[in-house]
């Protein structure tokens, strides 16, 4: 049996946490041969609820669950962790301006970034799920100067998976047969899901669908506003699908994608006209525990416009919290 890996989950007593923890403990994220020790972080007022979740985790008798730590202190939560899923974030309350939301999360992710910097394993893989995910990931990265910026990622896998399912429904093909989908930009309604390069059994998805009006007026708005549609229908934000996307993201990053494209929010290297350092969704392939962006894709006029639109939103978010970094 391998030595256990320490995995931190923040917001562990929350809705996404509840959908996530049992799947991590069962081996779905890091493999069925990899024991884990869960480091569970949540607010002081959530510690009792967190104990209840831990009781349930114990009651599953997962062979791979080698231990658990519950805490409200990020310095304890991130000690020696190899994987950190930053799920907890300040939700937007009624009447709250986006600027205030950015500010509140700025404080949270500055503290967590610093704690990761001081206590996590040097090769820690960080995934930010809590919204606004790209900007929160950027804040955490900036607050951890001793860690490689490449260690920090934002979750665009939910947008990616949402886009896959819409394409499968439109073409009548199985979702697993779709390859080479890309999602660009921010995890927000401005994201740009791009199937120009996608194939199903070697055939072009763009040629199969062959409908630019559907792409612009149905597909992109449906994927972009899917989170809002779920809140409208269920009265709660998407939790199980977000947890599923987080599992997919980390599993692929750690275990590899076998040459398949997936989408991750990563610090830009300056390619595709995206300024260096911006936390931006791009297509990647993963192998040997590292992601490599897919290079050399042609960007047409419509794509450029959509990619610049989502970039502008990211730069606006970043400007709103720039004062946190002097």
UniProtKB/Swiss-Prot annotation:
One of its GO terms (molecular function) is L-malate dehydrogenase (NAD+) activity. Keywords: NAD, Oxidoreductase, Tricarboxylic acid cycle. Pfam families: Ldh_1_C (PF02866), Ldh_1_N (PF00056). Substrate binds at residues 92, 98, 131, 162. One of its GO terms (biological process) is tricarboxylic acid cycle. The active site is at residue 187. InterPro entries: L-lactate/malate_DH, Lactate/malate_DH_C, Lactate/malate_DH_N, Lactate_DH/Glyco_Ohase_4_C, Malate_DH_type2, NAD(P)-bd_dom_sf. The keyword Nucleotide-binding does not apply. NCBIfam families: MalateDH-SF1, PRK05442.1. Catalyzes the reversible oxidation of malate to oxaloacetate. Belongs to the LDH/MDH superfamily. MDH type 2 family. This is Malate dehydrogenase. It comes from Chromobacterium violaceum (strain ATCC 12472 / DSM 30191 / JCM 1249 / CCUG 213 / NBRC 12614 / NCIMB 9131 / NCTC 9757 / MK).
């Amino acid at each position: 049996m391998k030595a256990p890996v320490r995995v931190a989950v923040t917001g562990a007593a929350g809705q996404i946490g509840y959908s996530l923890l049992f799947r991590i403990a069962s081996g779905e994220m890091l493999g069925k041969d990899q024991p884990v020790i869960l480091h569970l972080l949540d607010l002081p007022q959530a510690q009792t609820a967190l104990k209840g979740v831990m009781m349930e985790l114990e009651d599953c008798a997962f062979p791979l669950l080698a231990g658990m730590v519950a805490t409200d202190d990020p310095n304890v939560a991130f000690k020696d962790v190899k994987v950190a899923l930053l799920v907890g974030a300040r939700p937007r309350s009624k009447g709250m301006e986006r600027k205030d939301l950015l500010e509140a999360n700025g404080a949270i992710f500055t503290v967590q970034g610093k704690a990761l910097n001081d206590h996590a394993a040097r090769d820690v893989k960080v995934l930010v799920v809590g919204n606004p995910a790209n900007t929160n990931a950027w804040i955490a990265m900036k607050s951890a100067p001793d860690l490689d910026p490449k260690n920090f990622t934002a979750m665009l896998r939910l947008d990616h998976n949402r886009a896959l399912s819409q394409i499968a429904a439109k073409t009548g093909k199985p979702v697993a047969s779709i390859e080479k989908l890309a999602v660009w930009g921010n995890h927000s309604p401005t994201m740009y899901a791009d199937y120009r390069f996608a194939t199903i059994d070697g055939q072009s998805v763009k040629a199969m669908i062959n409908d630019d009006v559907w792409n612009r007026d149905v597909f992109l708005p449906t994927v972009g506003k899917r989170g809002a549609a779920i809140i409208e229908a269920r009265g709660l934000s998407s939790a199980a699908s977000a947890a599923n996307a987080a599992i997919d993201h980390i599993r692929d990053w750690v275990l590899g994608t076998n040459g398949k494209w997936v989408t991750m929010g990563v610090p830009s290297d300056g390619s595709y006209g995206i300024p260096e350092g911006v936390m931006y969704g791009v297509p990647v392939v993963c192998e040997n525990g590292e992601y490599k962006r897919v290079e050399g894709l042609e960007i047409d006029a419509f794509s450029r416009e959509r990619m610049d639109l989502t970039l502008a939103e990211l730069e606006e978010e970043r400007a709103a919290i720039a004062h946190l970094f002097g």
